[in-house]
Amino acid sequence: MHCTGCWAAEYGHQLNLSLDDIDSIIRQGKELGTYMYIYTGGEPLTRKKDVIKICEMHPDCAFLSFTNGTLIDEEFCQDMLRVKNFVPAISLEGFETANDSRRGDGCYNSVKRAMELLKKHKLPFGISTCYTSVNYKDIASDEFFDLMIDAGALFCWFFHYMPVGNGAVKELLPTPEQRAYVYHQIRKFRSEKPIFTMDFQNDAQYVGGCIAGGRRYLHINAKGDVEPCVFIHYSNCNIHNTTLLDALRSPLFQAYHDNQPFNENMLRPCPMLENAGRIQELVKQSKAVNTDYESPEDVDHLLEKTVPYAKNWKPMADKLWDEQKK
């Protein structure tokens, strides 16, 4: 699957962490008090047997996987019922036309089949949706929320489109008015709809700003590079030759630690998207290197895409934040 504007597209698709690598990361994480682990792709369920094996090896942990849903079948549902510590979050970009225009023809119907199977077995699952300038009204509509609820979804992660990588499509970035629309709709439906929603970009107030850089979360890519965030493709270290604890002590992670929160306005939490120049400072200060192996992106090039967005979003963010504080 080749999704338009995918943030993971330029890592390359031939890299994988081994089962032993993943087991080691989890064992180290548990020593630090971490008992929840999230898989992202590519498509994590191409390794269904390993996913279930890890669940068996670590029954004291909870696991979630972002997935396109195409590989969820009867056998996998039975495995989920047996291990009881795995939950899928199925990617859905709106209704059929919007979804398949970004994720490929037929993907919407595959998602529907997966949700029907999960609901039949009374298995918990959620939805993951990326909102853009194209689909923002669809994913923030009564109809879309009701579709998720009727399908049996218990939660939905909402992700703002991120212009990461040389193949990013800047035109997919929502305008300030479009982002504000999503912001208001999600909050409105929280008091009206029986589904738990998390807006990764607009809910920073509940977690004190950016959670990346090991403050509450980090990302390890398929080659083992330890990154501050799934959207920040820069690193000083690799899990194959360092410990998780030492990765947290690496220059880039320490730069995050010393600078969070990146803004007192919790609607401007990200050092890349909403705070022009901050990610550039962090990367250059720490001498971190880009981890997009197929098409490396210089941090100055990344900055060129986000400076206009940050400038345009600031007045709207300040207005919304002031309204919240009243």
Residue ranges of model-derived segments:
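Flexible mid-to-C-terminal extensions adjoining Fe-S/redox cofactors in radical SAM and related proteins
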Residues: 231-326
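Secreted/processed peptides and extracellular or luminal domains of membrane proteins
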Residues: 9-12, 216, 235, 276
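Radical SAM enzyme [4Fe-4S]-AdoMet core and its adjacent flexible, acidic
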Residues: 61, 100-213, 222-223, 227, ...
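N-terminal pre-triad scaffold of radical SAM enzymes
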Residues: 1-4, 35-39, 220, 224
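Short cysteine clusters
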Residues: 3-6, 210, 224, 229, ...
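Canonical Radical SAM [4Fe-4S] cluster-binding loop centered on the CxxxCxxC motif
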Residues: 1-19
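Radical SAM/AdoMet-radical enzyme domain recognition
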Residues: 22-39, 47-159
